[in-house]
Amino acid sequence: MKIILFLSLLIWVIPGFGKVKIQKPRSQHVTAFAIIVDEMTLEKTGGAVEAYRDALEADGLSTYIVSGNWKNPDEVKAEIIKLNKRKPVLEGVVFIGDIPVALIRNAQHMTTAFKMNEDEFPFPESSVPSDRFYDDLHLTFDFICQDSVNTSHFYYKLREDSPQQLRPTFYSGRIKYPEARGGDKYEAIAKYLAKAVREKKRANLLDCFVSFTGSGYNSECLLAWMDERLALTENFPLAWKNSRTAKFLNFRMEDYMKYRLFDELQRDEMDVMLFHEHGAPDRQYICDGPAPAGLQGYMNYIKSSIYSFVKREIERKKGTPEEIMAYFTKEYALGSDFFKDFSMEKIAEQNSLERLKTGIVLEDLKELKTNPRFVMFDACYNGSFHEDGYIAGYYIFNDGNTVVTQG
């Protein structure tokens, strides 16, 4: 009788929310896990999702598959709350495919670095996409509105009478394909799930890691990283065999460190890659390029910097090009022929080429097979899963071995 109950497919129809289907766990364990997926993704990747479920159950988690044509975050959260009240206790959830995104306002006191005036800047810029809406059931929110352009985005305000500290009820993650990458997203999700199942079956010890620090991070203070070695020694004790299995890299080591990092990312034995850098949804800021050398080198550097400042002021329409050049000439006591080589087009081309060499961008990752099983982005925005293209997504959706990213 118990076997029949566990193999049965339970379908709940909730008034006002539409049809939600719940496949109950196939085995009984101490804790439970939930796969939350949209109907279309499940239809297109059903076999891969079920294989993923089986791998989780083999790992000791009673696993639900919850699917629906989700209309808003509240609908998803209602199902999670119901599961959380069941036995065994819910340990974690994963969101696969097109699950609505909650963007939170009135909660910047709980963000590490993101601070933006919510009254002065538009909602998409000044709101924080966060799955704490789903996994921290202590928090309470007021719904504001649905985004009129990106209809999978919904804005919520953290209530003043809500708890004001993060205390997640369980852990959560997302498997969301970055559609800017192109291709069939359902095929890519199925391929990723197969990779996750494959890696879970491997007997792979964590015995190889690389930690990288980019320019401008922690004020470029080397002393700030002295304790990282102690922490990693305690957490990854098997990795300290030689300089290849426990490696620390710094942006100063080469003029353009991104190419050195590409070599590290493609090593098959890599288990963990730690990035400490500044970031954007579509870029990892790695270095600043080569330092000036000699008198002429510094003169060229100063000239290039001033040209870039002038170009920026012209683009901001702070005056005519002649007025802006006259201001800089007077401010910095420049010679009369200092701007004779000034060209907006030439500066834009030079800056673009330099930017490509000093950062890892989405186009780089599109052709790269990343192999560290886990990649951490200690950086702003690299994990912006609500964007069509985001760095963390490109690391897991390729033919390498990366299965988990944190950003």
Which residue stretches match the model-derived regions?
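Bacterial Sec-dependent N-terminal signal peptides
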Residues: 1-20
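Cysteine-dependent hydrolase recognition
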Residues: 19-407
